[in-house]
A protein has these predicted regions:
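Short, acidic/polar linear motifs in exposed loop/turn regions
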Residues: 75-78, 117, 132
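Beta-sheet-dominated interaction scaffolds and their linkers
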Residues: 27-75, 142-145
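Short, solvent-exposed loop/turn segments enriched in Ser/Thr/Gly
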Residues: 62-69, 116-125
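Buried hydrophobic-core signal for structured, non-transmembrane domains
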Residues: 68-74, 109-111, 124-129, 140-141
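Bacterial signal peptide processing site
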Residues: 21-23
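Terminal connector regions
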Residues: 25-29, 119-145
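Surface-exposed binding patches on compact interaction domains or structured appendages
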Residues: 77-105
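C-terminal motif of bacterial Sec signal peptides marking the signal peptidase cleavage site
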Residues: 17-19
Length: 146
């Protein structure tokens, strides 16, 4: 997929994030290589909707492994479990807490991107399976590896 199409797709999906209720808060994050300010993404799971989150890692140094926490909020009336996920690339991983998220509760998951073997614009898709088939959850991940 041409890079301009990837960028256009990520920008278009950013508009969908607003519609599903994803919110952002600023938090500081430390890694072994540097200290950076990072945006904490919030995914709000609602019955009858698919929550789409765009996780933009920005510029990533080649061979770096970077993480982004995502707060998942259960806005339904029933407990939800994040059962499993599928991804378009093995360089993108998700650390799921498979404990039930109570109604109105929240948990934190961690999205990891391993840039080893990647160059230039990278865009991946993660589809998270929940215990409620009426609550969809997807993550669009982007990074530029230099």
């Amino acid at each position: 997929m041409p890079m301009s199409l990837r960028v256009a797709t990520l920008l278009a999906l950013l508009l969908f994030v607003v519609a599903c209720g994803a919110k952002q808060t600023n938090e500081e994050s430390e890694s072994e290589e540097c200290v950076t300010e990072q945006t904490m993404l919030v995914a709000e799971l609602e019955e009858g909707k698919t929550c789409e989150v765009i996780a933009d890692f920005g510029v990533v140094t080649h061979r770096a492994i970077v993480e982004m926490p995502i707060r998942v909020v259960n806005a339904t009336d029933e407990p939800i479990v994040l059962v499993d996920y599928s991804t378009t690339c093995r360089c993108t991983m998700l650390d799921l807490d498979r404990a039930p998220i109570e109604a109105g509760g929240e948990c934190e998951i961690v999205l990891t991107f391993d840039s080893r073997g990647e160059w230039g614009g990278v865009g991946n898709f993660l589809d998270i399976t929940t215990s409620n088939p009426e609550c969809g959850f997807v993550i669009w991940m982007g990074a530029t590896v230099e």
